[in-house]
Amino acid sequence: GKEKDVFMDKLRDAGAAGIDYLKHFTHHIVKKKN
């Protein structure tokens, strides 16, 4: 139903933010190593 759609949207947003955070985090680590 509608609530599930809203939940999935929130989950997708959280996932996208998490991926951005991970990319930023790994980029930081790579920069430190070099």
Swiss-Prot record:
Expressed by the venom gland. Keywords: Antimicrobial, Secreted. GO terms for cellular component: extracellular region. It comes from the Eukaryota. It is found in: Secreted. May have antimicrobial properties, like most ant linear peptides. This is U1-poneritoxin-Na2a. It comes from Neoponera apicalis.
